[in-house]
A protein has these predicted regions:
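Catalytic core of Fe(II)/2-oxoglutarate
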Residues: 53, 105-159
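Short, basic/aromatic beta-hairpin or loop at an interaction surface
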Residues: 95-106
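A mid-sequence, solvent-exposed acidic-amphipathic segment
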Residues: 36-88
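Intrinsically disordered or highly flexible coil/loop and linker segments, enriched in small
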Residues: 28-35, 114
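Single conserved hydrophobic/aromatic residue that forms the stacking wall/gate
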Residues: 1-12
Length: 159
């Protein structure tokens, strides 16, 4: 099976306090914290050189629908601009809530009400918009092998 969560626009629309907090945020994304986590350091460094960290807005606008979509996932390591005078305790470089907020946002994709679950069969075709969804491949096929072909369509990037 595969699951996709649609950009979590519904969460963004409903949670006014969260919406105000995350609107200006940017986040760091790294392949190292997922695929590279269990690799020897040499392979991890080579992977990171091939796929360097990137920084993106946490809330992006879909170029065709105008919908606000969240861009946080398992590759998101931290917010890069959460430290402000309003949310850092005096005299300490400690940001309360940043870790919990990131866990909350990434955890929303695991809620079944925000997902479409696709059961693959021979000849199945599924299409989703990577600019507004997150994909998860359930590990429900062993001892069989998972074989699929994936194609990407070049389009307008989300801004």
């Amino acid at each position: 099976d595969s699951s996709t969560s649609r950009g979590l626009g519904d969460v963004y629309k409903r949670q006014d306090t969260v919406k105000a907090l995350i609107a200006p945020l940017r986040a760091r994304h790294s392949i190292e914290c997922t695929f590279g986590a269990a690799m020897p350091i040499e392979r991890r460094l080579a992977l990171k050189a091939q796929y360097p960290d990137a920084e993106h807005p946490v809330v992006r606008t879909h170029p065709e629908t105008g919908e606000k979509v969240l861009f946080v996932n398992g590759f998101t390591t931290h917010f890069t601009n959460f430290h402000t005078p309003a949310n850092v305790r005096v005299g300490q470089d400690f940001t309360q809530g940043a870790s919990g907020l990131l866990q909350y946002l990434t955890g929303q994709a695991a809620i079944p009400e925000y997902q479409v679950r696709w059961r693959w069969r021979a000849g199945s075709v599924a299409i989703w918009d990577n600019r507004a969804t997150q994909h998860y491949a359930a590990m429900d096929y062993p001892p069989s092998h998972r074989k699929m072909e994936r194609a990407g369509i070049v389009g307008t990037p989300t801004f």
